[in-house]
Design a protein with these regions (language model features):
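Conserved G1/Walker A P-loop phosphate-binding module
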Residues: 1-72, 76-88, 92, 170-174, ...
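C-terminal-of-GTPase-core extension/linker across diverse P-loop GTPases
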Residues: 4, 9-17, 23, 97-195
Length: 195
């Protein structure tokens, strides 16, 4: 028997993309945060209050690497937890690498999601450019936004350190989660009508 976490939205990305920092910023969860890969070794849940009497559960999924769907970096274990979410929040670090390398990182995570499950590949996804407060990110943010938008993604640029953009992102996630909940209710009603 296997226990899978139940969350409304899941944070995905490479190690050190800023997933734990974002979860700590927007919820009461206190994941370990450090500047080395695989600080997060197990999924962590946080409850995000995004409007009066409205909240959602956000899962910090440990970083995914190439080959995760085959178990590298324990990725297959982590991907099982993100299967239960209705919305993926895909974080990319604007401060560490060139725009081309960051876009390749974005593609790597999406390939791993698709290799694990076609359903995950089709899951609604919001792209988030992180660490925009760092001087090394300044030159990359606009081009990353443009290129991610060109792929059809809604894009947010945030700093978990300063909080810049986090409230707007959480509001958007909250609306996305509510939309997902409505779709599930409608699907359940349709399924009941067919029975």
């Amino acid at each position: 028997m296997e226990l899978r976490l139940l969350a409304d939205a899941g944070l995905v990305g490479l190690p050190n993309a800023g997933k734990s920092s974002l979860l700590a910023r927007v919820s009461a969860a206190r994941p370990k945060i450090a500047d080395y890969p695989f600080t997060t070794l197990a999924p962590i849940l946080g409850v995000v209050a995004w409007a009066d009497d409205k909240n959602f559960v956000l899962a910090d999924i440990p970083g995914l690497i190439e080959g995760a769907h085959e178990g590298l970096g324990l990725g297959d274990r982590f991907l099982r937890h993100v299967e239960r979410t209705s919305l993926l929040i895909h974080l990319v670090d604007a401060s560490e690498r060139s725009v081309d390398q960051t876009m390749e990182d974005f593609d790597t995570v999406n390939r791993e999601l698709a290799a694990y499950s076609e359903d995950l590949a089709d899951r609604p996804q919001i792209a988030v450019v992180t660490k925009i407060d760092l001087p090394t990110a300044a030159d990359n943010v606009d081009e990353l936004r443009e290129r991610l938008s060109a792929l059809g993604h809604e894009v947010f640029a945030i700093s978990s350190a300063t909080g810049h953009g986090c409230r707007e992102l959480m509001t958007r996630i909250g609306h996305g989660v509510e939309e997902g909940r409505r779709r599930r209710i409608e699907l359940n009603a349709e399924t009941s009508d067919l029975a």
